[in-house]
């Protein structure tokens, strides 16, 4: 299935407050989590307007499951299957067809909440993307790769599903994708060292996925991919306006491109040597 863009944009008038709630499609918020107790409370609070909250926990040892249950979420234990399959499991476990998929370190802003309620009162599409704002090195990014990081998170599961990708998963749909206003706030609160460790793991997983799919890399991709990425996000998308945090964020993304293809080339050489 392919994902197609649509120019439809919803921006509700926040100054107009109805005297009673509008009838709308019921929806579930689904969250995957593991050892996320320090972040999950804020996520659950921001999602409290949902008709149901489902938290799929993968063996937390820090009280994540207990915290979620204590705040009214339905908690399901499931061994880790990779990001895409874990999120799809959560979607299928929901009671309602309309779902909003969140990570434990994300929060729904008030403008986004208003947009979600508005579109669910009269859905004009089956899938909606929203701008995701990332906090990095203590700064909310406003340009470059960090914003607007359009993310398809609200959808009717009868028309869309998560991919099986173990990392950098995406929602697949054959329907047009509309956009709504209001930021999805992403604040991982992790250290830079922790962030870099995670990126190293992710690029290894990406390289493995590409190799198994029969993809191959050469010197051109190794050199051009990070260079073009830097030009795109630092200059064309004004990443330089985010100061040092913006530069570091984009530079890490460029390094990720280099490392991904370098690891893919290493897998290629290993395969040739073993023949």
Residues of each region from the PLM?
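Cell-envelope/extracellular polymer assembly enzymes that use nucleotide-activated donors
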Residues: 26-28, 52
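Short acidic donor-binding/metal-coordinating loop in glycosyltransferase active sites
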Residues: 58, 78, 96, 103-106, ...
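A conserved acidic beta->alpha catalytic loop
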Residues: 38, 46, 57-67, 103
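Conserved donor nucleotide-binding strand/loop of the catalytic core
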Residues: 65-93
């Amino acid at each position: 299935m392919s994902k197609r863009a649509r120019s439809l944009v919803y921006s509700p008038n926040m100054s107009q407050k109805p005297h009673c709630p509008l009838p709308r499609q019921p929806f579930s918020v689904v969250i995957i989590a593991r050892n996320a107790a320090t972040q999950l409370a804020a996520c659950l609070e921001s999602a409290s307007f949902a008709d149901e909250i489902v938290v799929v926990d993968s063996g937390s040892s820090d009280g994540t499951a207990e915290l979620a249950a204590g705040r009214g979420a339905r908690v399901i234990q499931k061994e880790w299957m990779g990001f895409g399959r874990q999120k799809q499991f959560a979607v299928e476990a929901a009671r309602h067809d309309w779902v909003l998929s969140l990570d434990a370190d994300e929060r729904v802003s008030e403008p986004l909440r208003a947009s979600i309620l508005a579109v669910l009162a009269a859905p004009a599409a089956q899938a909606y993307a929203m701008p995701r704002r990332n906090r990095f090195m203590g700064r909310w990014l406003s340009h470059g790769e960090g914003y607007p990081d359009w993310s398809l998170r609200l959808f009717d599961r009868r028309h869309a599903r998560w991919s099986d990708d173990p990392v950098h998963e995406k929602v697949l749909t054959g329907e047009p994708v509309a956009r709504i206003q209001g930021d999805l706030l992403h604040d991982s609160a992790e250290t830079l060292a922790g962030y870099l460790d995670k990126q190293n793991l992710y690029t290894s997983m990406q390289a493995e996925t590409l190799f198994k799919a029969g993809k191959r890399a050469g010197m051109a991709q190794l050199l051009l991919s990070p260079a073009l990425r830097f030009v795109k996000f630092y200059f064309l998308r004004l990443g330089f306006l985010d100061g040092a945090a913006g530069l570091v964020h984009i530079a890490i993304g460029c390094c990720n491109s280099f490392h991904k293809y370098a690891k893919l080339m290493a897998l290629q050489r290993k395969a040739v040597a073993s023949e």
